[in-house]
Structure formats: C-alpha cells, structure tokens
Amino acid sequence: LKYIFVSHMESDECGGLSVFFKEYPDMTVICSALCARELPGFGYQGKILVGSPGTFYSDKAIHMQFFDYPSEVHLQSGLLCYEKNSGIFYSADLMLRFGNGSGKTIKRAWKQEIEAIDITRIANDEKLKKLQGELLEISPALIAVGHGFCVECEK
C-alpha cells in the first residue's frame, strides 16, 4: 500500500490510519491542507502529501486531480479526487448511498450524479455550483463513495 486518500477530517474517514500505518509504515496519506495540519494532533506520524484543489499529482502509476470539497455543514476544506488512469472518482460523502453496498454497484449517468448534489451536501450555493461545473469536465468510469453503493458511470 503506497497511498491512502483522506477526503476530510472525520473519524469515519481517517480513524483507522494507525492500523494501516503500523502495517505499511512507508505509506503516504493524501489529504487537504486542513487535514494535514490536524492529523499529527491525532498521533499520525507518517508521510503526508497535501493535495490542493485545482492541482494534480502524478507518479508512475497514478495521475490524480483534486477538487475542493467544502464538506458537511461546517464547509471545512475537504478534498475530492479523480484518478485518471483508473477512471475512479473518490467522492467522500458527496455522493453517498445508504444501505450495505459491500460487493455491489449501481449504474447511473455521471451527469445525473452531479445534478443530484444539492444544498444538503454543500451548504453554500456558490460553492455548490462551482463544484458542479468543475465535475462536469471529467468523465469517471466509477464513483468510489465514502458510504454505501459505488456507482458505475453510464455514458
């Protein structure tokens, strides 16, 4: 395991880092600047790579594009990620699904997923519209959700 992507600083997104770090001490956490500042306060001592909205990170195996994720009602600076080589969009809690999605996927058009993002997911209309516009510029094959069923994107 080389990387772990942490979308935002909540226990269900990063609470198990110490378990992974113990097994993979050379791993790197990819996260927002806010999360990078907070992780050491929770005991994480490993490598951290800060992803900034509108930027990219590449190595031999991956090519990641980062998006601002004003997550939850607090509008904290989280991060969304699109890995271009695999076509996977890591959506955090933005496109979550309820229910046990273990081993299951659903099919839906990417545009429908973007249009379904509403003020309950991003509680600022200006930031919501900006993110929707940015996401319309990519075409993922799969949405890896933070909770529930992953989504196979239909064309």
Predicted regions and their residues:
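Short acidic, glycine/proline-enriched helix-loop-strand junctions
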Residues: 25-27, 152-155
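Short, basic, glycine/proline-bearing loop/turn elements
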Residues: 2-4, 61-64, 112-119
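Short amphipathic alpha-helical segments
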Residues: 17-19, 42-43, 103
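Active-site metal-binding motif and surrounding structural segment of the metallo-beta-lactamase
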Residues: 1-30
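Conserved H-loop
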Residues: 8, 34, 147
